[in-house]
From Swiss-Prot:
Any one biological process term the GO annotation gives: negative regulation of dendritic cell differentiation
Modified residues (Phosphoserine): S42
Transmembrane intervals: 60-80, 92-112, 122-142, 204-224
Lineage top rank: taxon: Eukaryota
Subcellular location(s) of the protein: Membrane
Induction: Up-regulated in kidney upon proteinuria.
Keyword Hydrolase in record: no
Pfam family, one: CD20
Annotated keywords: Membrane, Phosphoprotein, Transmembrane, Transmembrane helix
Entries under InterPro entries matching the protein: CD20-like, TMEM176A/TMEM176B
UniProt protein name: Transmembrane protein 176A
Cystine pairings recorded for this chain: none
The protein's assembly and partners: Interacts with MCOLN2.
Length: 244
């Protein structure tokens, strides 16, 4: 039964003529308008990297403002410590105080300008950045000049003096053992005090150097952004010329 059906089907198919085969060849060539649109789409992807770079530079600026504020506070605190001791000539110029105050003001005004904007805040921010740079340079010069300077009562003979401020009319005699021990202990503590004061001055110098670098950060970020934008513009021009 199935064999007869297959024979019948074959009999029906065989008389039919073979269908012609059509091969359609389409040659597609992009127009100049399509190329321009593709180039525009590719160029629109570049600002994504630019926005990423802008966010990175903004974070660097915020970090520099925080560093300025913290270092300014540390400068004031260390300056107050040295002023309490009043053993150094550095406190007479007040370098730790005006340097720290200007740095803290520069950081605070930068944050306010970022939050509120405005020409007045921008002008104040620029002036305080310049002032922070100048005060940091002046403080470094003063601190390096007076790094090893001590007042008269911290000299080498501070432990040999009498308790009175007048000239002693008694001739010098060989100190007794108790007096010799006292002098030795006094010299030991005086040397420790000198080491402490030198360390505080070195810390202040380090803080002022960091403040100098922090005040230069906005300028460095601005120059870097200018070069980055210039490189992006040249890349866009080259890409557009290559597409056209």
């Amino acid at each position: 039964m199935s064999t007869d059906m297959e024979t019948a089907v074959v009999g029906k198919v065989d008389p039919e003529a073979p269908q012609p085969t059509h091969i359609d060849v389409h040659i597609h060539q992009e127009s100049a308008l399509a190329k321009l649109l593709l180039a525009g789409c590719s160029l629109l992807r570049i600002p994504a990297s630019a926005s990423t770079q802008s966010q990175g530079s903004s974070r660097v600026l915020v970090a520099s403002w925080v560093v300025q504020t913290v270092l300014g506070a540390l400068s004031v605190v260390l300056g107050g410590t040295l002023y309490i001791g009043h053993y150094l000539a550095m406190y007479s110029e007040g370098a730790p105080f005006w340097t720290g105050i200007v740095a803290m003001l520069a950081g605070a005004v930068a944050f306010l300008h970022k939050k509120r904007g405005g020409t007045c805040w921008a002008l104040m921010r620029t002036l305080l950045v310049l002032a922070s740079f100048c005060t940091a340079v002046a403080a470094i010069v003063i601190g390096s000049r007076e790094l090893n300077f001590y007042w008269y009562f911290l000299g080498d003979d501070v432990c040999q003096r009498d308790s009175s401020y007048g000239w002693s009319t008694m001739p010098r005699t060989t100190p007794v053992p108790e007096e010799a021990d006292r002098i030795a202990l006094c010299i030991y503590y005086t040397s420790m005090l000198k080491t402490l004061l030198m360390s505080l001055q070195a810390m202040l110098l380090g803080i002022w150097v960091l403040l100098l670098l922090a005040s230069l950060t906005p300028v460095c970020v601005y120059i870097w952004k200018r070069f980055f934008t210039k490189a992006e513009t040249e890349e866009k021009k080259l890409l557009g010329a290559a597409v056209i």
